[in-house]
């Protein structure tokens, strides 16, 4: 069991993550006190450190299914670990040093579990590069990494892992909330008002494509000159093609019951190619295409809420890179009608660095032997300790 006395002492932790958009390493330096209902997190510093261009290209190629030798895989693993270690060191400049690092690593492959007959299940699989033992060695700081595998080993999806953190940082005594992450892939945490049984009612899952699909489209439409649509301005100048959105929403993933998870394996380059092929008869302009892909993200989120949530939330809080896409935010607000759409900044948690903050908290919990997963979100049969500890 964890020590309540230890949890009262501020724990200075670095949280690190690079998401499915592969746009860089988000690093957050935080001070944590408490554990669950008394959890308090102060963000001291947050910054995104871009990958070197050649490393990003190699990661994206592997995520798209390109074959790679074991030697190349080892080199990539080392290069990512080095980049994460450097980010951890740089974020601490000017501050007292951290005593713990929580590193998610870089996901390059994710396979959800699959039912294999009555009472049987083929376990999922996940691979995050950027090994924690190397980060611990290079920084001299104890590092927790490989967070997803313990949940997967007992039959869960290993995702989403952030809902338990969201529950203790962003819940409200009288209001139900959805925390909607708009990273490469969209995912939600539904958090009911804090009643007697509120923790058991929390749920979460991946809603579908978000930034990664939009970014891939921008790169394709600009022949690589741009990597994203700033503020969604380009998409905002176009008009969505609703018949295409309706067609794309027939994809089986959107109709799978939660818990569920996905990634670039399903919504990556091959899927985008199919989207462009589907759009050919409509002769859409580049702006129209981006507006239509944005509308798919919005429609998949709203469909998820209306189909699978026990009730619509009273408020939605956005986080992740897509929370800065003003056009996407406006379209989501329009679709959700009277449900206010805000960012987690307005609830006191940085929308840009919430995921990095979450992995700092998960590392803090692992150090105190507190489970980090929520079975109602990941589909695991029970709670488990998340992450492997590497002494610094």
Swiss-Prot record:
Reaction catalyzed: 1,6-anhydro-N-acetyl-beta-muramate + ATP + H2O = N-acetyl-D-muramate 6-phosphate + ADP + H(+)
Pfam family, one: AnmK
Pathway of action: Amino-sugar metabolism; 1,6-anhydro-N-acetylmuramate degradation; Cell wall biogenesis; peptidoglycan recycling
Primary role: Catalyzes the specific phosphorylation of 1,6-anhydro-N-acetylmuramic acid (anhMurNAc) with the simultaneous cleavage of the 1,6-anhydro ring, generating MurNAc-6-P. Is required for the utilization of anhMurNAc either imported from the medium or derived from its own cell wall murein, and thus plays a role in cell wall recycling.
EC number(s) given by UniProt: 2.7.1.170
Record keyword Nucleotide-binding present: yes
Listed InterPro entries: Anhydro_N_Ac-Mur_kinase (IPR005338), ATPase_NBD (IPR043129)
Name by which UniProt lists this protein: Anhydro-N-acetylmuramic acid kinase
Family per record: Belongs to the anhydro-N-acetylmuramic acid kinase family.
PANTHER family cross-referenced by the UniProt entry: ANHYDRO-N-ACETYLMURAMIC ACID KINASE
Keywords attached to this entry: ATP-binding, Carbohydrate metabolism, Kinase, Nucleotide-binding, Transferase
């Amino acid at each position: 069991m964890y020590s309540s006395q230890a949890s009262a002492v501020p724990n200075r932790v670095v949280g690190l993550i690079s998401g499915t958009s592969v746009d860089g390493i988000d690093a957050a330096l935080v001070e944590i006190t408490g554990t669950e209902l008394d959890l308090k997190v102060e963000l001291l510093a947050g910054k995104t450190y871009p990958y070197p261009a050649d490393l990003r290209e190699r990661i994206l190629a592997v995520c798209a299914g390109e074959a790679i030798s074991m030697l190349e895989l080892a080199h990539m693993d080392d290069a990512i670990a080095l980049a994460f270690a450097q980010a951890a060191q740089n974020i601490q400049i000017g501050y007292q040093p951290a005593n713990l690092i929580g590193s998610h690593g870089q996901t390059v492959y994710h396979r959800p579990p699959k039912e294999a007959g009555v009472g049987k299940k083929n376990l999922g699989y996940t691979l995050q590069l950027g090994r924690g033992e190397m980060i611990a060695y290079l920084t001299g700081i104890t590092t927790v990494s490989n967070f997803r595998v313990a949940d997967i080993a007992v039959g869960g999806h290993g995702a989403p892992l952030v809902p338990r953190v969201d529950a203790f940082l962003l819940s409200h005594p009288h209001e139900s909330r959805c925390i909607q992450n708009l990273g490469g892939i969209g995912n939600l945490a539904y958090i009911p008002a804090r009643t007697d049984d509120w923790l058991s009612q929390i749920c979460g899952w991946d809603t579908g494509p978000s930034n990664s699909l939009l970014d891939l489209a921008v790169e394709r439409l600009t022949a690589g000159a741009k990597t994203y649509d700033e503020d969604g301005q380009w998409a905002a100048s176009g008009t969505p093609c609703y018949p295409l959105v309706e067609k794309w929403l027939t994809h089986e993933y959107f109709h799978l019951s939660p818990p569920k998870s996905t990634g670039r394996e399903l919504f990556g380059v091959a899927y985008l190619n199919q989207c462009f092929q589907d759009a050919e008869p409509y002769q859409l302009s580049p702006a129209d295409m981006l507006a239509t892909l944005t509308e798919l993200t919005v429609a998949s989120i709203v469909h998820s809420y209306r189909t699978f949530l026990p009730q619509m939330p009273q408020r939605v809080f956005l986080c992740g890179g897509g929370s800065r896409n003003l056009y996407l935010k406006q379209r989501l607000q329009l679709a959700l009608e009277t449900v206010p759409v805000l960012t987690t900044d307005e609830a006191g948690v940085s929308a840009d660095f919430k995921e990095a903050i979450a992995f700092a908290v998960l590392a803090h919990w692992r150090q105190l032997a507190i489970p980090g997963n929520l079975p109602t979100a990941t589909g695991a049969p029970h709670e488990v300790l998340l992450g492997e500890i590497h002494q610094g």
